[in-house]
Design a protein with these regions (language model features):
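Non-transmembrane, aqueous-exposed alpha-helical and coiled segments at domain scale
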Residues: 1-205
Length: 205
């Protein structure tokens, strides 16, 4: 089915656009392991594979979000599965949905040091600009998915030499906790998934 083929298609496309050899799937690997293997060219560590699995489950098993609604809306017209998945991906790409973790990585890359994170956040808040990865239309408390991803993000950052990214993320969270937690604004699933994805080798786009 197309759902089973999508990870391979994405990995093939990434290898092609970066001028690297295409890697065939290994039937002995799980879906998460195969995706990372075909994408990066090396077998993922158990922690990386677990992180990919956890991310897939946390994002998929979460009720009727915008991209799920988009897919179901298309299917309700008796359209085809390809059109429904295309609609869902189009919705997911938006910066207020799945594209938010890309925005988090852009933000982290703009902050030169851990020490600079506080000023960056406070300046943004003073201008009433959004801090990516915070706030949720349903959760007015800490997103339970972010709790799981924070643990994985820290472990992966330590294992892959990205400790500075995690440290900046944690500092941003601490500053935001002091500034806006009373308003019900907490990290959402996209905040720590950004550093998690970076550490397991997923490209920014």
């Amino acid at each position: 089915t197309i759902l089973a083929q999508v990870p391979a298609i994405l990995a093939y496309y990434h290898r092609y656009r970066t001028g690297q050899a295409i890697i065939r799937p290994d039937k002995n690997l799980s879906i998460a392991e195969n995706f990372l293997y075909m994408l990066n060219g090396q077998r993922p560590t158990p922690t990386m594979a677990k992180a990919m699995d956890v991310c897939l489950v946390l994002h998929a098993d979460h009720g009727l979000n915008n991209s799920t609604f988009s897919a179901r809306s298309v299917m309700s017209t008796q359209s085809d599965m390809y059109s429904a998945i295309t609609a869902a991906i189009g919705s997911l790409k938006g910066p207020l949905h799945g594209g938010a973790n890309e925005g988090v990585m852009v933000m982290l890359n703009q902050i030169p040091t851990v020490e600079a994170a506080e000023k960056y956040v406070l300046d943004k808040l003073a201008k009433k600009e959004k801090i990516m990865g915070f706030g949720h239309r349903v959760y007015k408390a800490y997103d339970p998915r972010a709790t799981h991803l924070q643990v994985l993000a820290k472990k992966l950052a330590e294992d892959t030499g990205n400790a500075d990214l995690y440290a900046k993320s944690k500092r941003i969270e601490d500053v935001m906790a002091n500034a806006v937690a009373a308003k019900g604004i907490y990290p959402n699933v996209d905040f720590y998934s950004a550093t998690t994805y970076h550490s397991i080798g997923l490209p920014l786009d």
